[in-house]
Amino acid sequence: MKTLLLSLVVVIIVCLDLGYTMQCKTCSFYTCPNSETCPDGKNICVKRSWTAVRGDGPKREIRRECAATCPPSKLGLTVFCCTTDNCYH
């Protein structure tokens, strides 16, 4: 009986979502010293980069954020997705 109860407890612990929340850098700069906790349902860190043309010439832009899905890359837009805390490179 004790073995059955212990087995049940182990199965419950393994199967339950224990409230883990993803930590991602969320900013629009090349370096992000701090990370933020992603909201529920957004368990992917996304880094988008592109070149924006402004009055002073082209400039590389970067945006880091939490997301529910990994968006596709497009012409002129590079997307990097990862699923571990602060996993940008």
From Swiss-Prot:
Main location: secreted
Location of the protein in the cell: Secreted
One Pfam family recorded for the sequence: Toxin_cobra-type
GO molecular function: toxin activity
Signal peptide limits: 1-21
GO cellular component: extracellular region
Keywords per UniProt: Cell adhesion impairing toxin, Disulfide bond, G-protein coupled acetylcholine receptor impairing toxin, G-protein coupled receptor impairing toxin, Hemostasis impairing toxin, Neurotoxin, Platelet aggregation inhibiting toxin, Secreted, Signal, Toxin
Annotated motif Cell attachment site, positions: 54-56
Function: Exhibits M2 muscarinic acetylcholine receptor (CHRM2)-blocking activity, but has a weak binding activity toward nicotinic AChR. Moreover, it inhibits collagen-induced platelet aggregation.
Family indicated by similarity: Belongs to the three-finger toxin family. Ancestral subfamily. Orphan group V sub-subfamily.
Protein name: Long neurotoxin homolog NTL2
